[in-house]
């Protein structure tokens, strides 16, 4: 009985010891697990622990969870200077957003040595600016005025050229003698204004057509371009003058210095001159115009004859 009790005691004790070892081991094993969990948690806390920024030494940093491209080199971000850096990597100077900040150039202000020396330069600059603005404002108006002046200049040149051609001196041509026709015959003489009786054509001068005709030159220094027209016009004007006034003389303005120049008074009633020129009845041969000279077989049959 004692042995069983000892065995039981030993067994219980052993069991207790085993249980104690078991539970002790369990407890001890639980302590080892806690240590491992603690170590893992410490590692996680170390990752989340705020690090100093290597650029500005600020503790306002964070670990990048999603923006990590390489787990062996975790990425951190500094909220102060807004820069990223990686552990064991190169510090980037590019800010978030990729903005490129250019360094502002400091403007060196030139201290004026003397105010009096700078005043003339400033006034000259103001004058230059005013001249540039005035030239810029008037450039459009000058361009439009140039086009208008060019057109008016061309028109003026054409008018002056025509005037020069008209006023150019032609040998033997007299501008005041614009009323001369033919070989120096005056239109007033042809109308009978220069005669004593006034002439038959004295009233024709009041018509506007005659006044318009008087302003047209027909001759140049007493010489016509077409000699036949000149002769015809001269003969007709002489006949009109003699019909209007038989005693009127035809005056030649170009030869007024010679008193003997001019036609002598013609008298149709006198025996002077060829009377056969105007008396056609004396030279008509009645035998030539008789019926016997124009008779023919055809006319006899038809009964028609020429007078």
Swiss-Prot record:
Q: Which GO molecular function entries does the Swiss-Prot or TrEMBL record give?
A: DNA-binding transcription factor activity; transcription cis-regulatory region binding; zinc ion binding
Question: Could you confirm whether the keyword Thylakoid appears in this record?
Answer: no
Q: Which GO terms describe its biological process?
A: regulation of DNA-templated transcription
Where is the protein localized? Nucleus
Fetch the InterPro entries from UniProt.
Dof, Znf_Dof
Name the segments for region: Disordered: 96-147
* Zinc finger region(s), Dof-type: 51-105
Sequence positions that bind Zn(2+)? 53, 56, 78, 81
Keyword Metal-binding on entry: yes
Q: Name one GO cellular component term.
A: nucleus
Keywords (A to Z) from UniProt? DNA-binding, Metal-binding, Nucleus, Transcription, Transcription regulation, Zinc, Zinc-finger
PROSITE patterns (UniProt xref): ZF_DOF_1, ZF_DOF_2
**Bias-annotated ranges (Basic and acidic residues):** 124-133
List where Low complexity composition bias occurs: 134-147
Q: Where is the composition biased (Polar residues)?
A: 109-123
Task: Mention any Pfam family matching this sequence.
Answer: Zn_ribbon_Dof
Annotated function: Transcription factor that binds specifically to a 5'-AA[AG]G-3' consensus core sequence. Enhances the DNA binding of OBF transcription factors to OCS elements.
What is the name of the protein in this document?
Dof zinc finger protein DOF5.4
């Amino acid at each position: 009985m004692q042995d069983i009790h000892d065995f039981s005691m030993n067994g219980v004790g052993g069991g207790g010891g085993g249980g104690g070892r078991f539970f002790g081991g369990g407890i001890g094993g639980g302590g080892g697990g806690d240590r491992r969990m603690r170590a893992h948690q410490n590692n996680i806390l170390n990752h989340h622990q705020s690090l100093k920024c290597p650029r500005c030494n600020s503790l306002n940093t964070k670990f990048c969870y999603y923006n990590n491209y390489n787990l062996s080199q975790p990425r951190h971000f500094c909220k102060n200077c807004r820069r990223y850096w990686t552990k064991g990597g190169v510090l980037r100077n590019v800010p978030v957003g990729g903005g490129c900040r250019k360094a502002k150039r400091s403007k060196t202000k030139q201290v004026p040595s003397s105010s009096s020396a700078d005043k003339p330069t400033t006034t000259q600059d103001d004058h230059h600016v005013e001249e540039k603005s005035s030239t810029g404002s008037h450039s459009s108006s000058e361009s439009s005025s140039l086009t208008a002046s060019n057109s008016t200049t061309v028109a003026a040149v054409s008018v002056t050229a025509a005037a020069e051609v008209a006023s150019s001196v032609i040998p033997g041509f007299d501008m005041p003698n614009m009323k001369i026709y033919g070989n120096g015959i005056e239109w007033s003489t042809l109308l009978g204004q220069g005669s004593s009786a006034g002439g038959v054509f004295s009233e024709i001068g009041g018509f506007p057509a005659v006044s318009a005709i008087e302003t047209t030159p027909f001759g140049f220094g007493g010489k016509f371009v077409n000699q036949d027209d000149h002769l015809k016009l001269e003969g007709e004007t002489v006949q009109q003058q003699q019909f209007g006034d038989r005693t009127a003389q035809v005056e030649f303005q170009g030869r007024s210095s010679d008193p003997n120049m001019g036609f002598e008074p013609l008298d149709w009633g006198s025996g002077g001159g060829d009377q056969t020129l105007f008396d056609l009845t004396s030279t008509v041969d009645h035998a030539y115009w008789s019926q016997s000279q124009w008779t023919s077989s055809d006319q006899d049959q038809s009964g028609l004859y020429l007078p």
